[in-house]
């Protein structure tokens, strides 16, 4: 498999803490001793980030899944915000929608936002939303892969021209509460809507994967990215 293009730039996860804990933006040290909700695998980005901040993710905090969030059809954002409000967790690691629900509801505040530089600089390139496919698909159906890249780029451009389109699409996939928020979530992130995959990202992602024990070695940019489609970015 190879990465074909980016859906957006940077690690798209936020650390949201209970509002009554009064943790300041960027104060990672204040997270010590807290119970933090995070989905399996997704938690790896948080663990690596905490290590960069000098916090032991196994000894200094308790990171575990939020009960009820792994059930199909359940909204992570709504469930996580409710768990935060009920005091079942002290903080959670979520994408933009999950964070927005908690902040808008008044139960949470953002502490870490790697995409905007609130966190270790290296964490920006730990992960990134991408379109990936198999080498077989690339070899046998390159026109289909190219069409998918063009479609992604067109959507990114369309969102920048008219962010209200996000609400129209959101109605088909999100509960009413999230649908009402999606346009403002997308609008805030429009500067990151770029299909390019950079060598800096691949270098950072490789280092992250090695640190997390997910791989060994240091594959090159060409080993990781299907560069024949880069002219479409």
Indicate where each model-derived feature is located.
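Short, glycine-/small- and polar/acidic-enriched structural segments
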Residues: 1-76, 90-96
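Residues within well-ordered alpha helices
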Residues: 30, 49, 101, 169, ...
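Short coil/loop linkers at secondary-structure junctions
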Residues: 51, 56-58, 108, 176-178, ...
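Pocket-lining segment of extracytoplasmic ligand-binding domains
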Residues: 72-172
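Secondary-structure end/capping motifs
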Residues: 139-216
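Conserved C-terminal helix/tail region of periplasmic/extracytoplasmic solute-binding proteins
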Residues: 209-233
């Amino acid at each position: 498999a190879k990465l074909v293009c980016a859906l957006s730039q940077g690690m798209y996860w936020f650390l949201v803490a209970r509002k009554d804990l009064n943790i300041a933006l960027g104060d990672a040290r204040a997270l010590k001793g807290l119970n933090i909700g995070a989905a399996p695998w997704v938690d790896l980005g948080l663990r690596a980030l905490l290590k960069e901040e000098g916090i032991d993710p196994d000894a200094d905090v308790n990171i575990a899944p939020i009960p009820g969030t792994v059930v199909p059809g359940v909204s992570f954002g709504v469930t996580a915000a409710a768990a935060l409000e009920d005091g079942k967790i002290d903080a959670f690691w979520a994408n933009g929608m999950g964070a927005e629900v908690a902040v808008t509801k008044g139960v949470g505040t953002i502490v870490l936002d790697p995409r905007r530089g609130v966190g270790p600089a290296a964490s920006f390139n730990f992960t990134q939303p991408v379109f990936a496919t198999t080498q077989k698909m690339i070899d046998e159906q390159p026109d289909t892969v190219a069409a998918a890249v063009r479609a992604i780029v067109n959507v990114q451009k369309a969102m920048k021209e008219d962010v209200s389109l996000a609400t129209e699409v959101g109605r088909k996939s999100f509960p009413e509460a999230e649908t009402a928020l999606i346009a403002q979530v997308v609008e805030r992130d429009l500067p990151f809507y770029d299909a390019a995959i950079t060598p800096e990202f691949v270098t950072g992602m490789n280092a992250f994967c090695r640190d997390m024990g997910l791989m060994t070695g240091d594959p090159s940019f060409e080993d990781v990215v299907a560069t024949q489609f880069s002219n479409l970015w």
